[in-house]
Amino acid sequence: GMARKRPSRTGGTVVVLEHRSKILADNPLGDPAQRKLGVWLPHEYDSDSTHGRGRRFPVLYDLVGFTGTGIAHLNWKPFSENVAERAARLVRDQRMGPAIIVFPDCFTSLGGNQYVNSSAIGNYADFLLDEVIPLVDREFRTLASRDHRGCFGKSSGGYGAMIHGMKYAAHWGAIANHSGDACFDFIYRADWPNTLNELGNFRRPPRKAGRYQNRADSVDDGRLAQGLDDGRVRRFLDAMWKKQKLTPGEGHALMNVCMAATYDPDPAAPNGFRLPFHMETGALLPQRWKRWLQHDPVLLVDKYAANLRRLKGIYV
């Protein structure tokens, strides 16, 4: 039973590797290049008479959601299963064949990752494809081809799986997208008023009650109309990085700032990215939003239809 959890003899093995990434070295946020990589090996990996020598296994990559970490999916959970325990049960019940499951760490100072390349965050797609996959194929007995390699994830991880299936079908044979970010007009746009309020707390000088006029011809307005930070985003980030605990509003604001850095990076802009809304008036900036929509899976299906057809499996 769930309440009396005991280690299972057929639960497989968890291995944690530490590796230093060349691709994440000197990333713009100063996030660590040294990363932990969780790997779950099924019971069958070591169980047969030759200690599994020679037998190779397919590999699944677990892309975690925003604010998540790969290793956390291996944590002990009372009254529930972690991902490794669930996989062990599914293999034991013959609902799934034995496979190696990999838990990459793609966490960033902006609270998470969409598993794509961004000049404002780092090249996390390259990190996965050019470093993590070859490392796993080198260290473990894998079936080292796209036909035996898949990725799955929820939320940001679902987005990552979808985009990887679209853009990088040479590396992946199947993808599973659980509640991945899509239809940006619907999911992101309505969330920005809260974010503009949170960022407004870091406006200098602070906003006072009373009549307020935004002068459309001012220098400040010109910069804000281009989605450039007037300092409040920088102050917001510096404040968030010092806090022990974020409020729900701050957490959502951090997420939206992370999405701006993901979808509209600009090395020449303050902080390395632009914002999709005018931070004083709250007006959507159509030129900036166009850049976001270039990353919306709903609008990319036709462009990447040939790659999607190459996949053996797509779960949405």
Question: What is each residue range found by the language model?
Answer:
Residues G1-Y315:
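Non-catalytic cap/lid and distal C-terminal segments of serine-dependent acyl enzymes
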